[in-house]
Amino acid sequence: MRDALGREVRSVRISVTMRCNMACVYCHREGERPGRSELSAAEWGRLLRACAEIGVRKVKITGGEPLLRRDLIEIIENAEGFEEVSLVTNGVLLADYAGDLAEAGLDRVNVSLDTVDRKLYRKLTRSRFSPDDVIRGIEAAVSEGLTPVKVNVVLTSETVKTLPTLVEELADLEGLKLQLIEPMGSIPGFRPAHAEDGLRALGEYEPELERVRTFHSREVYRLNNGMAVEVVKPMDGVMCEACTRIRLTHDGKYKGCLMAPPKPLPRDDFGELVRTLKEYVRTRDDTFEVHQGTSVMGRMRGDVSGR
């Protein structure tokens, strides 16, 4: 299905929880505890069926930290039939669940790992965890075939300095892609960095442009060790023109854009749910451009993860 601007909606990001076991300095939720508003696995199954009815082909599960949900496996099983089901995670619990996730039908994962420097990692995540926990999770994901594993790195003046070491730590693993993500908004105690800063820190690379989806190409580079590096600029260039996704919040509301306010969806009548989704998609606009002069973090609260 296409919206009024001719963009085909092909994917949905579902935030299954706002709970998190970290309090990352750049996260707009900062580990905030929600009320009892999370949808059940069955309710997610119903919403996903409605998404399939309007032509959505890919599902990305986000949070919060999705692995905190005890019924995550059931949610993944309810996504059967889509072309791709992926998961965004901080990775610290991934080693324990990778096998079950793969068996349930998960195709691949995005894992957040901004640095392998232990002190800096704890400063960024404000947690008791270590980069070693995340690396074990990445290794387990690769072993279970949840590839390509995209390793998300939020760029700051400090994480840029540790990028070469991070690449060295992961160099022996196949099936990885590094994503250099420019942060949205300010980061307390840190100076944001640009993708070009990260590329310079990585040293020699050979540029190759790779079209990753219709309407949209991101710069992709290949390091001398063969690892692909993808540049993600969330609010730059043709972001809105290229957008082919919709979002559903942890409490079952629709967002046509990360920056948009959530809209309610019917809970009881499935036909009405499908009709409402179609109407929301049909009238989807370039919300970022509309709200360019407002607070980024203010527009993002109420979720859905931008990772």
Swiss-Prot record:
User: Is the Hydrolase keyword given for this protein?
Assistant: no
- Whether 4Fe-4S counts among this entry's keywords is yes
A single GO BP: Mo-molybdopterin cofactor biosynthetic process
Q: State the protein's name.
A: Probable GTP 3',8-cyclase
User: What detail does the entry give on cofactor binding?
Assistant: Binds 2 [4Fe-4S] clusters. Binds 1 [4Fe-4S] cluster coordinated with 3 cysteines and an exchangeable S-adenosyl-L-methionine and 1 [4Fe-4S] cluster coordinated with 3 cysteines and the GTP-derived substrate.
Which top class of enzyme applies to this chain?
lyase
Q: Which residues bind [4Fe-4S] cluster 2?
A: C240, C243, C257
Query: Which InterPro entries does this entry report, sorted A to Z?
Result: Aldolase_TIM (IPR013785), Elp3/MiaA/NifB-like_rSAM (IPR006638), MoaA_arc (IPR013485), MoaA_twitch (IPR010505), MoCo_biosynth_MoaA/MoaC (IPR050105), rSAM (IPR007197)
**Cross-referenced HAMAP family:** MoaA_A (MF_01225_A)
Which domain of life does the protein's organism represent? Archaea
UniProt lists the gene as: moaA
Q: Which organism is it from?
A: Methanopyrus kandleri (strain AV19 / DSM 6324 / JCM 9639 / NBRC 100938)
Give the function comment from the record: Catalyzes the cyclization of GTP to (8S)-3',8-cyclo-7,8-dihydroguanosine 5'-triphosphate.
- Listed EC numbers: 4.1.99.22
Q: Which reaction does it catalyse?
A: GTP + AH2 + S-adenosyl-L-methionine = (8S)-3',8-cyclo-7,8-dihydroguanosine 5'-triphosphate + 5'-deoxyadenosine + L-methionine + A + H(+)
